[in-house]
A protein has these predicted regions:
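Short edge beta-strand/loop segments characteristic of extracellular beta-sandwich folds
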Residues: 108, 120-124
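Surface-exposed, low-complexity/disordered Ser/Thr/Gly/Pro/Asn-rich loops and linkers
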Residues: 65-116, 201-203
């Protein structure tokens, strides 16, 4: 009888551990933390606290999908992060530092099984004279061509002015049905204005993509 009870206990502990590993980080509460739109699911999240430039996969990806980023222009490293858009259970830690000369940063984030996706992240430039102060946001639904349709229709903009203090940036792709349930969805951030020098950088932290499960 005691052996049977021990066996059952071990099974329950193992099952609980597996469920915990599959659960997404909860949205935080308090200053600077993330508040997902009602009904949204966190799909991908990068906090860069592991400081591993070779690990391009998201710190969290919804089970069954994998988010990755790619930056090939210059080199990247890490520095002190931001408390904007934090996910509960993490701290400001480190952020991704994209160094000049910079071109673009691409986040591949399949939306298979989801729609109404929203991208949110914190960013700052290293100074007003070095480090890109203008970012242009485009996205692809076919894995080849990058467009701005969902961001610029109805008078919207796909450009962001970047300051020297971390700001929060949000881009909503819900108006383009081709983004929904799309394994080829990716977002490109193209740098301009003070991005061609040999010094300076832009810093990204707490990047999240949320969506509604279909």
């Amino acid at each position: 009888m005691k052996k049977n009870l021990l066996f059952i206990t071990l099974i329950l502990i193992t099952a609980a551990s597996c469920v915990k590993d599959r659960n997404p980080p909860a949205a935080g509460t308090g200053g600077g933390t993330q508040n997902l739109p009602s009904g949204d699911t966190l799909m991908y999240y990068w906090n860069f606290n592991n400081q591993d430039s070779s690990a391009r996969t998201a710190d969290y990806s919804v089970p069954g999908l994998t988010g990755m980023y790619n930056y090939s222009a210059s080199y990247i490293d890490f520095t002190g992060g931001s408390n904007l858009n934090l996910i509960n259970g993490t701290d400001s830690g480190q952020c991704l530092r994209v160094r000049n000369p910079s071109q673009d940063l691409i986040f591949s984030m399949p939306t298979t099984g989801y729609d109404s996706v929203v991208l949110t992240y914190a960013e700052e430039a290293s100074s007003t004279t070095s480090g890109s102060t203008i970012n242009t946001i485009t996205y692809t639904t076919d894995g080849v061509n990058y467009i701005s349709t969902a961001l610029t229709n109805n008078g919207g903009s796909n450009q962001a002015s970047i300051g020297i203090v971390f700001g929060l940036y949000t881009f909503n792709f819900s108006s383009d049905p081709n983004v929904n349930n799309n394994p080829k969805f990716a977002v490109k951030i193209t740098f301009s204005n003070n991005n061609t020098g040999t010094s300076g950088n832009d810093r990204f932290d707490n990047i999240s993509l949320s969506g509604v499960r279909q």
